[in-house]
Amino acid sequence: MAYVPLSGTNVRILADVPFSNDYKNTRWFTSSSNQYNWFNSKTRVYEMSKVTFQGFRENKSYISVSLRLDLLYNASYIMFQNADYGNKWFYAFVTELEYKNVGTTYVHFEIDVLQTWMFNIKFQESFIVREHVKLWNDDGTPTINTIDEGLNYGSEYDIVSVENHRPYDDMMFLVVISKSIMHGTAGEAESRLNDINASLNGMPQPLCYYIHPFYKDGKVPKTFIGDNNANLSPIVNMLTNIFSQKSAVNNIVNMYVTDYIGLKLDYKNGDKELKLDKDMFEQAGIADDKHGNVDTIFVKKIPDYETLEIDTGDKWGGFTKDQESKLMMYPYCVTEVTDFKGNHMNLKTEYIDNNKLKIQVRGSLGVSNKVAYSIQDYNAGGSLSGGDRLTASLDTSLINNNPNDIAIINDYLSAYLQGNKNSLENQKSSILFNGIVGMLGGGVSAGASAVGRSPFGLASSVTGMTSTAGNAVLDMQALQAKQADIANIPPQLTKMGGNTAFDYGNGYRGVYVIKKQLKAEYRRSLSSFFHKYGYKINRVKKPNLRTRKAYNYIQTKDCFISGDINNNDLQEIRTIFDNGITLWHTDDIGNYSVENELR
């Protein structure tokens, strides 16, 4: 219970004071003169020049007023001076009107410790639970406040923005990997065919790589290698002919489609023009003596892969800007990055250490597709720089390693002919050799019989020669029949090709940046709460007593307030701030619909 002086002068019983002793709200002043003028302007219900207060023993201080109770019904506040305190003004709440008799009413009161000692206390650094803070930075971006409020925000989001980002817009790459070189070199005939071509492709490796840029409609970009136009074949021709070429059939290890091959290429989407480094790539014509030429690109070497950056624009773009900046934070707003292939990550937009959301793309030419998408400067501390920031972004990455394979047809006849080519040639040679030897042997025998004048011997020898030749023909026919039987076996898919047709046919390429926001009803509910009570900050600091135009809410824990006042009143003031109180800077107390911008 606050200390009450024994007496008072210039006692004024007031009406229309819009706050009470629950200390949920109070009027905050910048000077004692402003404070006096504000209270003195309120309606005076009754005045007394000098009063001795009563009820101290019962801890129920009151003033005996010579007025009927019903004439005091609107009395809510008292102000008075005390000579013993240098004529200081004291302020008090009317707590009860007690009927004494027809002409006398006891007006019970208790000291308003906050108004009475407002200019006698000093805030020290204290633990601030919540208060009104600065909402927006000077550049219009929200200030960061992510402390959990423990409030219900629902279980569903509205999707407010969907953007698809691809490394090279509509262009993609068919990657063909072979065990050996499938093309010749201009001026060198076919001297390189079937050569093993060990090279640098991120690391030393023995396989050969061909790339073929194309679009969904089957067309190819105008491609230059150095200053030379590569005149690439349409993608359908490429696929049709590559399995017809003797240098390609069963030489192919894998084929897949990818959005990014690990290099920042000079590509102009508007002109559909691609420029490649002649030291890394060369035009390749794959052909044989029976089929037309297929023009594609052979990868000579790739010493190092490069990171491609996609600037998606303002990281806050797409979100509905709310009056309360905290509603732009996670979990009220979420940025999701997904490829719709089972790979996704949820981002806290505020932790992107940049005003723009930039996607870093990493890729390679491996035996299968692998492309990584990471967010630049996500959770990157201010102490990181350069390559460290780039590396740190890998901690939050979406890695698309879906095979994206193209079906490979295995022709049993081609496989048999090529895989057993030497064996077949040996069999043919053996058949012919045995037939000739047999015929020669028969001829020698016939000659001997002729010398010996044995007509029967001559006849048998001729028969033997005929039989030997016939056996050779039969053996050749059997071998050809075996080959014909194999040719009648239907071609089979040795690799089905995964979901490439579904993913690319439906346009699921690159990554999608999806922005989600709370349902409108929850945004309204939380916005009104934050507007009234500010944000949790859980920090040790001096409170913001007057940073807003209309009001400041402050709640502390074990706050530290000093002042040249009695300890009982000081402790009560500390309790008021620990419980939370709204300090009003305007006379429109209780009207939370007013604009409450920063001063």
From Swiss-Prot:
A Pfam family recorded for this sequence:
Caud_tail_N
Q: Which domain of life is it from?
A: Viruses
Biological-process GO terms, alphabetical: symbiont genome ejection through host cell envelope, short tail mechanism; symbiont genome entry into host cell via pore formation in plasma membrane
Taking the record's annotation, the residue ranges forming a coiled coil are none
Q: Where in the cell is it found?
A: Virion
Q: What does this protein do?
A: Distal (knob) tail protein that plugs the end of the tube before DNA ejection and forms a channel perforating the host membrane during ejection.
Protein family membership: Belongs to the picovirinae distal tube protein family.
Protein name as annotated: Tail knob protein gp9
Taxonomic source organism: Bacillus phage PZA (Bacteriophage PZA)
